Structure formats: structure tokens, C-alpha cells
Amino acid sequence: MKNLEHVCYNTRFSHIYVERRIRNHPRTEQILLRFPQAQIVEIEHYKDVFNRHGQDCVRQHQAQALILAEKTDHFFYEGAPVCQDFGNTNFYYCSTMMNCIYDCSYCYLKGMYPSGHMVLFVNIEDYLEELDHILKTQNMYVCISYDADLLAMEAVTGYVRLWSAYAAKHENLKLEIRTKCAGHAMWDLPCLSNVIYAFTLSPQKMIAVSYTHLTLPTNP
């Protein structure tokens, strides 16, 4: 039965939900080109899928769908006092993506979101425009990979490269990028003092017992 159940799952991103208002957005088109076999489903709002009641997040993660959407407000959130700000002032975080391709058993996202699917906001330029206004009056420490692993999705989004290019032009901005990704997307980016990559490295034993499911070990 377990084997039958396993093969019945769709592959990741075999279904992509797209908000109608951003269907013709250039980034939407670029992303869809990467998944030519995906079934595209147009929706009015990402919450129509993501916030439905009675979803099984565990099973959904076995066949994760991608939801392309537009973020319209609350681009940046103040970090809670209990969160690690590493001594920096004006600590914020933002979510250009919600949910993660990894499936770590201890992750708080499992209890935070009602869905196991992934939301990607395609209008990152609106985040940067909002940041332009804030940086005129204060410095900022922003965690941009707080509710997802941006680096793990870099081949699809290119967002880490965009954030890095923005940080290079704004000395009063410091970015933190948390990741468990073993990809090489960051290696050809310039080394910037105000862009911090925070890696989680897990030994094989941790992965073997599924604490950090789908991540790569530190040893072959």
C-alpha cells in the first residue's frame, strides 16, 4: 500500500495556480516556461487555494503545487523581539515566497500555514520600491528568506540575484538569507559585506531520520 501511495503522487509543481491579474506578468511567463508540462489553473486570488479549510499539509507537500500571486500590501514586517536580530537595529523580514520545498519535521511553517503548497509573489519590484522609501529615513536589517528558502528556488525565481544587486547600491541595508540549499547559484554573485548567507548544515544522521527531509547532507 505504501508503494502504491507513493507512485500516485504528482510531481512537484505539476500544477501551477496563477492569479488572473498577473497571468501576463513577465515574471509569470518566465516561470511558466520552466514548467512546460505543468497544468495551469487560473484563480482570482491565491487565498482561494492556499487558505482553504481542511487541507492536508503533509500529503500536499508530497505533490507540492506552485501558486503565482501578487503581493499588494504589508511588504515588510517588524521582527518580533524574541527573534534573532544579531544586535542589529530596525530588524524586519519579508516574504516574497511562502512555504518551502524542504520538509523539515521541526519547521514552524507546518503549523503556520493552512496549506502545504508554495506561494510565490511575482512583483518583487514593488517590495524594492517600498524599501526605497524606508531607507531614506533609516537603516534596515532584513531577513528575506524567513518563510521559505529563496536560494533553493533561485533557478526558478532569480530573486537572490535581484536582492544582491539591490543591496550593492544601498549601504544602509543589510540582508540575511537563510538556507539549507547546496546549490551553486550564489557563487557567481559579488561578495558583499551587507549580504549575509546563513547556512544550516545537517549531518547524514539527521536526514536519515527525516528531521531535515529533502535537504542534502554535509558528507557524500
Where is each model-derived feature located?
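Surface-exposed cleft-lining segments at the edges of enzyme active sites
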Residues: A148, K205-Y211
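Flexible, acidic/Gly-rich N-terminal and inter-domain linker regions that tether
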Residues: M1-N90
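Conserved Radical SAM active-site core
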Residues: Q60, I67-F86, S105-A198
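Cysteine-centered iron-sulfur cluster-binding motifs in ferredoxin-type domains/subunits
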Residues: C94-C104
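Short connector loops/turns at beta-strand edges and beta->alpha or beta->beta junctions
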Residues: T200-Q204
